Amino acid sequence: MEFCNFSNHFSTFENILQNQLRNASSNKFGIHQENKLSKFQQCLIDRVNHPEPEYNFEYEGITYTVFVYDYFSWGVAIDVPRNHVHYNSPASYFKNFYGASDYEDGKILVMHIDENSYSLCRQIISGEPEYHESHYVSFETIKKQAVSIIENLCKYQTRFLNNVSSLYGNHCIYDLSKLGSRFSNNATNACCGHHNFYDFSKLGSKLNKTLQTPKTNGKTSNPSMRTDRQTQSRSQTRSQTKPQFMTQFEPLFGTQTVPMFGTQSEPLFGTQSEPLFGTQTEPLFGTQSEPLFETQSEPVFRTQYESQPKFQSNHGPKQDYSSVFDLINTILSDKKSAYDVPKYQSQNTTASDKSENSYPSTVNNILDRIIGSLAPVGKSTNSNNSHNECKPKSTTTSKNSDFSQLSNNDLEKLISEAMGKVFPGAEIKVETIGSPNNTNSQSDNKNNVVVCNDGTVISDYVYDDEEDYGDYAEEEYTESGSNFSEDLNASEKSHDSDASESSDHHHDHHHDHHHDHHHDHHHDHHHSDSNEYQIIPDSNVPSDNICSDNLCSDYNKQNNVSTVDFNLEPTDCHYSESQYDNYSE
């Protein structure tokens, strides 16, 4: 062994060692004399007696090696058998239970490298003696410590095997050499016959199941009952058999490996997979998908689309008025085709889309929705009392009657019946501006007026696209009469050109008729008609019949009457400039 830079001191060590050996031979060197030697002398004598760097030994069938480290300091490495219960334990476990310094690669290492351990290397380098409280670990001391650790290994292994033997009794001695360990039968029989090692290979399936299956409530299990239970579990599903493969290792060691993975794997993946993915998928995706997507879709969608051509056949481009639907649509939409009527929309529309969803078209759409429930309508009696509900009476009218030849009174009755269908329970009144029998009347237009239960006034008056202030006025009077002048201000600003042209006419018209015709109009308005709601649809009505806002509003508040003018223009409203300024502010 080479000592690097310490070759100069080797001669001195050798001389000292020879003198110590000479004295020991003359004084019959013993243990009591060894204790009197210094640590330096003990290290030199130990190194002379054991000049080799390594010494291999075997105890209880376990091999260990005593080697030199740190220049004349001894250590030991113990090989742990692979089948030992603590083979893969962490290093901390060996430090706590075996007193080892470290554990790595299946070797227990014991080395005294703490500050209290004597080191010849430190003393040689420093030139000063080691601490007096330090102790030197000799070759025999480290060997005894290795033997103690091996005995503890055998003790823990025996305790583990005794727990196994308590369940199944004693068996033959375990031959560790069959599993690749360094144990031998000779060493086991000679050195550790008092240890009960067992042969796992001869125990069979009982021992393997015991090693891998935990106990339940401290009760031992019957092997025959376990076999029956396992046989029943094999007929179950794959998910139930999976934990049994994890806990029981019969297929790994015993002779049952062939039936477990050979014949029994066939029903798991062969016969059971066929009904799962073979036969069951056919009714799920094959036969059941046909009635779901093919047979059911035919009556649902074909009946709806087949009925549409029948609906269109009665309303061809000829427009022969063969049904009440065509007749009423033509009357209410100002001779427009039924196909030009927009679809039903909500009545909660703003002022910006009045031209698209006007009031008569809304009534027309409502009639469109309920026309399917109308019975053949013929001649009906007209109620003289406008407050009574209109009850249509079917008369003898042929299906092929030409409704275009009907008179205005008959058309009026038909419209009344249709409006009664649209608004059941409402008061249906047919109001005529002017006398129908008087040819000199100012207007012969007739309107259907519907008073709903909530007080909403609905009329089927047809007006031109330019007359768009009627719907605007109706919304303001039905919602809030006080907001009419404010919104009228915005409407007048949007029509500056029309308002500027008629500004002179407006003041003259307001001044002349506000004082001359107010009392007459108020008197006529109070006695001429007993209806709760007045509808003035025609723009040809003279301005004498239009009262001022203050007096009419007072009258309306007292008699609960709302006046709606569908042809209201910004220049036709009668108000004072002071009132207009107050509202605009």
From Swiss-Prot:
Segments of skewed composition (Basic and acidic residues): 490-506
Organism from which the protein derives: Acanthamoeba polyphaga mimivirus (APMV)
Residue spans of biased composition, Polar residues class: 209-223, 379-405, 479-488
Domain of life: Viruses
Lineage start: Viruses, Varidnaviria, Bamfordvirae, Nucleocytoviricota, Megaviricetes
Biased composition (Basic residues): 507-525
Protein name as it appears in the record: Uncharacterized protein L397
Low complexity bias: start-end ranges: 232-241
Chain spans, region Disordered: 209-244, 377-405, 473-542
